[in-house]
Amino acid sequence: MIPKNVIINVAKEVGFDLVGVVAAEAMDDERKGFEEWLLEGNQSTLAYLERNVEKRFNPTLLVEGARSIIVCAVSYLSPVSRGYDATCRTKIASYAFARDYHLTIKEMLAELAERLGHEVEGLRFRAFTDSAPLAEKSLAVRAGLGWIGRNSLLVTPRYGSMLLLGELVINKAVDSYDVPMQGVGCGSCRACVDSCPNRAIKPNRLIDTRRCISCRTIEREGEQCEDIGLDGWIFGCDACQSVCPFNRHAPLHSNPRFDPKIDISRLDEAAWQGMTNDDFLAMAGDTPLVRSGLERIRKNIGK
């Protein structure tokens, strides 16, 4: 059995801002809500969300011998996360200016597992970061990191919602497990709902991906509402996060691995239109921007 304080201390030393630990078990209530969301068609072109639903909400089906899950979060909040000038037509979600978080967090989780392996004999693990069907936000809530805001994102008291999640599923029990937060939440605040240009935020903390700018600028193109626009966003969208009071009062990130690699001040429309693919890859080769590619980003300009 692993002492929880050892896990937390090592995870913080690795560079995570928040850490919680939960038992690996089925999350039936959360699965029911997700299945209802799917039945309403909110997933749009995100067909992968329809697969492996049972595994998504039961980690023991994903990882043989799973006993515990270490849930980690790290802030990426930077000055650009506070919002753009209203006239900007080349807005990019602030997480995309840094190295691809899938790579960085996987490295951090591997370091965490290696260091814990020195403390615990026979430790086996599997690392996740938005890379397999695992209900990350549900696990984060169960681990006491925060709550689900009206915009469907995890919100935390100290760091707001500009966070990236990673999980380590391990084969060992822990001496104590965390529980969900009590007495905190969004209250009557509707800033995120009111700020969404396309009314993508539905009641009950749900998102209609057909209207969500982040989905429309990044994911596979397909069915969408006729009245949708991109409001100047060309990759992702921070509209519902930049207005959140918890983000406005959160500290900027302190982990240098998430420092922006791209100078946003030079990326106006003319810069994008005059950029070659080689220029693009040299600038953004290991950032999330390559997921869309230069042609798709240009196509989003002016929509």
Give each language-model segment a name.
Residues 1-185:
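Auxiliary alpha/beta "docking" domains used to position bulky ligands
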Residues 155-180, 206-226, 277-281:
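Short, charged low-complexity linear segments at domain edges
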